[in-house]
């Protein structure tokens, strides 16, 4: 149950590595940031518990709760005051809910298992926790988890769930059961489909009035029978015989962390009848019920699945200038792991898009992986009290700027080098942005073709370049000198498609310079506007100077 898990501080801290840095804030700002986040979490909490409405995704709430705890620890605040759910329920649990401690990784699971035996793994079903009380073979009470000690009376609602047995016999005739009410699914694959806000949906169904029909889609997974049969197999057998079949179907004995990992992966990647957010490892033998207390269930632990999306703090905002002068915005992040990818940066988009997002350093954004593992922003989930946003560059850049290196042209100049080295232009194999930056920093290029003037000795003397790397690059530069004329023109940024240039058929710089706008307009995919841009490009002094420089180096098509 989402908010109920907050009763134990340590349960939240799995979201943050132990090395998470404390913010460099003044005491006044720290108090302000903490108070605002506490207030927001309290509002979400109230909406969730009192109205059954989730104003924020479960995972976002959990991660921001963990962030609050970290800030409180950094600045000496009370880490427990605001974390418990509001308790409107007054019905005591016959046996308290202990909660489950979360472990960060396989190594932690292995450590926990080391001195324990008779271990079992179960899915960590994503729903809302409940106590079911049977007396004389009848369901007499159903209690929401609440704060683990007291909760809401859900008896009438639970009696309307067909999947919950209304009567029991044998040892279960007088029993207290703890479990998870969940929304039934047909082959839910957690890795592909994510959590689907399952907890909030179930909570809403249990809170709202006049929704009898929706309760038909709920079921229950029993994960605890306090003071029940002494062995796990016997508990599971009797539960299954009474109509609580999911526990037996989805409980497996394990002897090692490898076993747990195998089952965890299988349940993460195959279809299940419920949403899960990890697995629970527990001992078959449990303490007597009189010893159960919230936060003290040391006989079970959880190993959660990696979230589909994670909340990341924005540590900086940078502006990148592309080869055509287009400005894009990149947000630097406090590193987060998504799948096996360490994400430190995310593309925001254009300046206009950045302004629409209203992202500043200190904000927290929800980040996920799009196609091909590219990080993307899903939403801004929390904004810092201080809005120190950098000013974007002015309108100094366009498609005809930065062919020559100047102090204000560094980013667009590098972007032009990256472009000319790409397969669409000169295809300088083995050279990416990092390599061009190293070369430019070491040899202070005057313009985008200055690298052609480098000697083999200069390449070998470039810091960070091995002898082998320098030799390969020298070979590449010599190959590039013989690229077709059309490739060089593409490298110079002519605003035409390669198809239009091929249709043109010019093989010399002189021919190309002599063409009129009317001529260019007749080529495929070249309208009046593009033809006009070609003439502007042709007449640009820097382009003319580059053409002369290439002619002096006897490059194909440029020599008289």
Curated annotation (Swiss-Prot):
It catalyses: NAD(+) + (deoxyribonucleotide)n-3'-hydroxyl + 5'-phospho-(deoxyribonucleotide)m = (deoxyribonucleotide)n+m + AMP + beta-nicotinamide D-nucleotide. Its EC number is 6.5.1.2. PROSITE patterns: DNA_LIGASE_N1, DNA_LIGASE_N2. The keyword NAD applies. GO terms for biological process: DNA repair; DNA replication. It is an enzyme of class 6 (ligase). Keywords: DNA damage, DNA repair, DNA replication, Ligase, NAD. The active site is at 124 (n6-amp-lysine intermediate). GO terms for molecular function: DNA ligase (NAD+) activity. Signal peptide: none annotated. SUPFAM superfamilies: DNA ligase/mRNA capping enzyme, catalytic domain (SSF56091), Nucleic acid-binding proteins (SSF50249), RuvA domain 2-like (SSF47781). Belongs to the NAD-dependent DNA ligase family. LigB subfamily. Catalyzes the formation of phosphodiester linkages between 5'-phosphoryl and 3'-hydroxyl groups in double-stranded DNA using NAD as a coenzyme and as the energy source for the reaction. This is DNA ligase B. It comes from Citrobacter koseri (strain ATCC BAA-895 / CDC 4225-83 / SGSC4696). The lineage of its organism: Bacteria, Pseudomonadati, Pseudomonadota, Gammaproteobacteria, Enterobacterales.
């Amino acid at each position: 149950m989402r908010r109920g898990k907050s009763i134990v501080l340590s349960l939240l801290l799995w979201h943050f590595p132990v090395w998470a840095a404390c913010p460099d804030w003044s005491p006044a700002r720290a108090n302000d940031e903490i108070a605002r986040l506490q207030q927001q979490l309290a509002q979400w909490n109230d909406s969730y518990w009192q109205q059954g409405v989730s104003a924020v995704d479960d995972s976002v709430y959990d991660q921001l709760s963990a962030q609050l705890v970290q800030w409180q620890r950094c600045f000496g605040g009370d880490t427990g005051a605001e974390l418990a759910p509001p308790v409107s329920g007054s019905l005591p649990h016959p046996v308290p809910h202990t909660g489950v401690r979360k472990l960060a990784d396989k190594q932690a699971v292995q450590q926990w298992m080391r001195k324990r035996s008779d271990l079992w793994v179960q899915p960590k079903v994503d729903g809302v926790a409940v106590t079911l009380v049977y007396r004389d073979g009848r369901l007499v009470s159903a209690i929401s988890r609440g704060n683990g000690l007291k909760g809401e009376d859900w008896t009438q609602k639970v009696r309307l769930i067909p999947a919950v047995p209304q009567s029991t016999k044998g040892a279960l005739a007088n029993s207290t059961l703890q479990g998870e009410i969940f929304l039934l699914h047909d082959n839910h694959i957690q890795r592909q489909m994510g959590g689907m806000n399952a907890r909030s949906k179930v909570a809403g169904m249990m809170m709202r009035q006049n929704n009898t029909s929706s309760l038909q889609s709920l079921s229950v997974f029993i994960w605890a029978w306090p003071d029940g049969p002494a062995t796990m197999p016997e508990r599971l057998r009797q539960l299954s015989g009474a109509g609580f079949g999911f526990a037996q179907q989805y409980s497996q004995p394990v002897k090692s962390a490898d076993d747990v990992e195998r089952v965890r992966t299988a349940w993460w990647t195959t279809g299940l009848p419920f949403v899960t957010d990890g697995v629970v490892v527990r001992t078959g033998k449990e303490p007597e019920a009189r010893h159960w207390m919230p936060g003290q269930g040391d006989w079970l632990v959880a190993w959660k699945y990696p979230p589909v999306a994670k909340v990341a703090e924005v540590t900086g905002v940078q502006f990148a200038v592309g080869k055509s002068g287009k400005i894009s915005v990149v947000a630097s992040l406090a590193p987060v792991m998504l799948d096996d990818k360490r994400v430190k940066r995310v593309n925001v988009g254009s300046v206009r898009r950045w302004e629409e997002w209203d992202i500043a350093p200190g904000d927290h954004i929800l980040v996920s992986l799009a196609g091909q593992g590219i990080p993307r922003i899903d939403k801004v989930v929390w904004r810092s009290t201080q809005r120190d946003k950098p000013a974007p560059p002015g309108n100094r850049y366009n498609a005809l700027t930065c062919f020559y290196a100047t102090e204000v042209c560094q980013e667009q100049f590098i972007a032009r080098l990256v472009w000319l080295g790409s397969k669409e232009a000169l295809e300088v194999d083995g050279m990416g942005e990092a390599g061009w930056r190293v070369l430019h920093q070491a040899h202070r290029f005057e313009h985008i073709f200055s690298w052609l003037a480098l000697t083999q000795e200069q390449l070998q003397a470039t810091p960070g370049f091995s002898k082998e790397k320098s030799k390969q690059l020298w070979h590449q530069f010599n190959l590039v000198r013989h690229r077709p004329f059309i490739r060089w023109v593409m490298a110079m940024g002519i605003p035409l498609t390669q198809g239009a240039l091929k249709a043109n058929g010019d093989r010399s710089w002189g021919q190309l310079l002599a063409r009129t706008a009317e001529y260019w307009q007749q080529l495929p995919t070249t309208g009046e506007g593009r033809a006009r841009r070609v003439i502007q490009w042709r007449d640009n002094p820097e382009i003319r100077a580059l053409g002369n420089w290439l002619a002096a180096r006897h490059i194909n098509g440029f020599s008289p």
